[in-house]
From Swiss-Prot:
Residues 1-20 form the signal peptide. The keyword Amino-acid biosynthesis does not apply. This is Periplasmic beta-glucosidase. The gene is bglX. It is found in: Periplasm. It comes from Escherichia coli (strain K12). InterPro entries: Cellulose_Degrad_GH3, Fn3-like, Glyco_hydro_3_AS, Glyco_hydro_3_C, Glyco_hydro_3_C_sf, Glyco_hydro_3_N, Glyco_hydro_3_N_sf, Glycoside_hydrolase_SF. It catalyses: Hydrolysis of terminal, non-reducing beta-D-glucosyl residues with release of beta-D-glucose. One of its GO terms (cellular component) is periplasmic space. Its EC number is 3.2.1.21. Keywords: Glycosidase, Hydrolase, Periplasm, Signal.
Length: 765
């Protein structure tokens, strides 16, 4: 595959602007060589040049290219983001080499979360694959395309554990579970960075948003987070540490406050934990405008105070504000910030530039100028095959009454819904340099699959929403949602007439991509009413009804679950989304995705997640009792639990077999089950292993995911799946904030989702 190509592209530095003889060369990419090099470089730098390295600016209206040129000339820029073509990146690096005194290279960054030009499923969809090979594919292709555009760093992966679907940025992460998020994040870092971020087709990652951003109160963007240290370190911190242990070179610091202190000014978080406890050596980057926001947080009196607090707390690079360059010179002069503190921040920035290989070749990710693509958006630059394969694995079959799916290609199919033919929405949030016109919609995918065999009819049926306030919000900066001027009833009538002419109705419904994005928190997580009215009208036709969901968060679907004959969760599936969805609808691919977040029955249940603590009065549905932990107007559990997902075949899981009834601290126990495909077609499923610490010094979750394996079985085939359990799987942060495992009984649960499991047990001695 072209994205795995390891052939280097020779870059003749003689073709580039003249370089400083003593700065660039064949420097060994070792910590020792780096430290010596950076120490000498710092000695040559002025205060202003050191401060300039701490400035990360975005290309845009506030910073036009002409203004950036002057900043570069004066050594006032350390890195650039939001520029994504080789031509633009080359021009800026040329300016550094031609105009600046020391010629310290820029690095270039972008939000490449689920693809650069080829857009893969959103991270929440990727998590649904429960397949680390799929994560590796996304990471390698994304890095290849980003590096091929000249980028050196991505603001990814996002590893914020989120248990509140009201939060719009849940779409960017890997879901509610600590273990799954840690595993996915670690794998993404390794895939994107490859052997070294200095490699031609690798990029440096930036784990974000540190810390606990996914736990904002009320699921409201930019809100505060308040939690015990035990919950913080047991549930929310492990994914960040996993990404850093995998070698991530950067951390983006969160916008929220944590237990009363904004993360941007939290020296305990950024120094005591990140540097001292975890040994992180890379750079910390503030989120967009976060330093100036310390004033509004109420922890800085004025801009100068905000800069002082941020730098002393451990923020190395300032994103998208001029505060460091404007106020640090005076703070240094007055002694409120020491030269040692400035040098420490600048050293971290220079270190990552060295690790990127920029002091060996500042054009390392650009290649020779003559290799620049004539058309930066050329079809030949896409990786459609990989995108389609990964997208298929991300799809989750939620319901399939009477085997409504797969559909017959010879049928007359009505494709209905405001998202059925939306090229933009299928790509989802943070679609990087992806081009909407290159994406495949569900309507197009179905037409491609049917060909001349059957007939495909189409009606839009409804607007995404009829709420003018929401439309205005979504279209605040551009026309992201196109509104059909027809009346709602006129559109529904057309859809009903289309449905009546068909054998089956496929309704593509859910959210526009802007509804599941940064700054897109919702209090109502149902499908918008305009679409619910459409679904009701389609149901009334009596035709088999298949709902294809397009969304970036779990939705409350109690009514739709009752109405639909089949429901396929597709998230935002990316460039090849339409073809991948059609593959599943027609049975060319057997769905195998599993939910990485629980789907609540209503917003009133939130947060609903599988790994909750027990109570002194737990609810038992088999033995109802008024005085137990429950709602009297709603069921306790999720509509669709974590790890849930159906297939076109069926599987059985045997009883759990333990290799031993007891385990020593330096030993291990292996838990095994036999999984059998009891259906009539080949299929894959995810075997999931959960643990429960039955009695401990503090209340522990009712179960926690500690292992998973995706297996493919032919009809009638049986496979033994085994999970080794060691002491690390049993440890937790206790009331004394000691990380350890406690002796006693442990339950082992193994199944194909978090609710349907077989149980075993062992004792830790």
């Amino acid at each position: 595959m072209k994205w795995l190509c390891s052939v280097g592209i020779a870059v003749s530095l003689a073709l580039q602007p003249a370089l400083a003889d003593d700065l660039f060369g064949n420097h060994p990419l070792t910590p020792e060589a780096r430290d010596a090099f950076v120490t000498e470089l710092l000695k040559k730098m002025t205060v202003d040049e050191k401060i300039g390295q701490l400035r990360l600016i975005s290309v845009g209206p506030d910073n036009p290219k002409e203004a950036i040129r002057e900043m570069i000339k004066d050594g006032q820029v350390g890195a650039i983001f939001n520029t994504v073509t080789r031509q633009d990146i080359r021009a800026m690096q040329d300016q550094v080499m031609e105009l600046s005194r020391l010629k310290i290279p820029l690095f270039f960054a972008y939000d490449v979360l689920h693809g650069q030009r080829t857009v893969f499923p959103i991270s929440l969809g990727l998590a649904s694959s429960f397949n680390l090979d799929a994560v590796k594919t996304v990471g390698r292709v994304s890095a290849y395309e980003a590096a091929d555009d000249g980028l050196n760093m991505t603001w990814a992966p996002m590893v914020d554990v989120s248990r509140d679907p009201r939060w719009g940025r849940a779409s960017e992460g890997f879901g509610e579970d600590t273990y799954l998020t840690s595993t996915m994040g670690k794998t993404m870092v390794e895939a994107m960075q490859g052997k070294s971020p200095a490699d031609r087709y690798s990029v440096m990652t930036s784990v974000k948003h540190f810390a606990a951003y996914g736990a904002v109160e009320g699921g409201k963007e930019y809100n505060t987070v308040d939690m015990s240290p035990q919950r913080l370190f047991n549930d929310y911190m492990p994914p960040y540490k996993a990404g850093l242990d995998a070698g991530s070179g950067a951390v983006m610091v969160a916008l929220n406050s944590l237990n009363g202190t904004p993360a941007t000014s939290d020296s305990w978080l950024l120094k005591d934990v990140l540097r001292d406890q975890w040994g992180f050596k890379g750079i910390t980057v503030s989120d967009h405008g976060a330093i100036k926001e310390l004033i509004k947080h109420g922890t800085a009196a004025d801009p100068e105070d905000a800069v002082r607090v941020a730098l002393k707390s451990g923020i190395n690079m300032s994103m998208s504000d001029e505060y460091y360059s404007k106020y640090l010179p005076g703070l240094i002069k007055s002694g409120k910030v020491t030269m040692a503190e400035l040098d420490d921040a600048a050293r971290h920035v220079l270190n990552v530039k060295y690790d990127m290989g920029l002091f060996n070749d500042p054009y390392s990710h650009l290649g020779p100028k003559e290799s620049d693509p004539v058309d930066t958006n050329a079809e030949s630059r896409l990786h459609r095959k990989e995108a389609r394969e990964v997208a298929r694995e991300s799809l989750v079959l939620l319901k399939n009454r009477l085997e409504t799916l797969p559909l017959k290609k010879s049928a007359t199919i009505a494709v209905v819904g405001p998202l059925a033919d939306s090229k933009r929405d299928v790509m989802g949030s943070w679609s990087a340099a992806g081009v909407a016109d290159q994406s495949v919609t569900v309507l197009t995918g179905i037409k491609n699959a049917v060909g001349e065999n059957g007939k495909v009819l189409y009606a839009k049926g409804a607007n995404v929403t009829s709420d003018k306030g929401i439309i205005d919000f979504l279209n605040q900066y551009e026309e992201a949602v196109k509104v059909d001027p027809r009346s709602p009833q006129e559109m529904i009538d057309e859809a009903v007439q289309t449905a009546k002419q068909s054998d089956v109705v496929v309704a593509v419904v859910g959210e526009a991509q802007g509804m599941a994005h940064e700054a897109s928190s919702r209090t109502d997580i149902t499908i918008p009413q305009s679409q619910r009215d459409l679904i009701a009208a389609l149901k009334a036709t009596g035709k088999p009804l298949v709902l294809v969901l397009m969304n970036g968060r779990p939705l409350a679907l109690v009514k739709e679950d009752q109405q639909a004959d089949a429901i396929l969760e597709t998230w935002f599936a990316g460039t090849e989304g339409g073809n991948a969805i059609a593959d599943v609808l027609f049975g060319d691919y057997n769905p195998s995705g599993k939910l990485p977040m629980s789907f609540p029955r209503s917003v009133g249940q939130i947060p609903v997640y599988y790994s909750h603590l027990n109570t002194g009065r737990p609810y038992n549905a088999d033995k109802p009792n008024k005085y137990t932990s429950r709602y009297f107007d709603e069921a306790n559990g999720a509509l669709y639990p974590f790890g849930y997902g159906l297939s076109y075949t069926t599987f059985t899981v045997s009883d759990v077999k333990l290799s031993a009834p007891t385990m020593k601290r330096d030993g291990k126990v292996t838990a095994s089950v036999q999984v059998t495909n009891t259906g009539k077609r080949e299929g894959a499923t995810v075997v999931q292993m959960y643990l429960q610490d039955v009695t401990a010094s503090m209340s522990r979750p009712v179960k926690q995911l500690k292992g998973f394996e995706k297996i493919t079985l032919k009809p009638g085939e049986t496979q033994t799946v085994s999970f080794p359990i060691d002491i690390e799987a049993l440890k937790f942060w206790n009331q004394q904030m000691k990380y350890d495992a406690e002796p006693g009984k442990f339950n082992v649960f193994i199944g194909t989702d978090s609710a349907r499991v077989k149980k075993g047990e062992f004792e830790l001695l």
